Amino acid sequence: YTTVSQGAHLCAGSHDFNSPNFQLYTKPITIGKNVWICADTFISLGVCIADGVVVGARSLVVKNICQPWTVHAGHPTKQIGKRKETLHD
């Protein structure tokens, strides 16, 4: 399972600002197992988040988080800790 807390925003689309009509483009967001996306976090299009990751409240995720069982926070996010892998089911 994965937990997505209140106010989190997963934005899988954007617009081409060089297009005269701001053409929409999309990329899927992939989130692994045992992930916690904390409150008010923004995750940008095309981002992949590995299993067991925690993303701290009000963080901005614009790049993949590939290292499993880590804790990330900030604008943009950076790794601030690690989790115990034994916590998973």
Can you say where each PLM-predicted feature lies in the sequence?
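Short acidic capping loops at alpha-helix termini that bridge into adjacent secondary structure
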Residues: 33, 51-52, 68-69
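Acidic, glycine-centered active-site loop in nucleotide-sugar glycosyltransferases
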Residues: 66-76
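Flexible, glycine/small-residue-enriched loop-and-beta-strand segment within the central core
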Residues: 1-48, 57, 75-76, 80-88
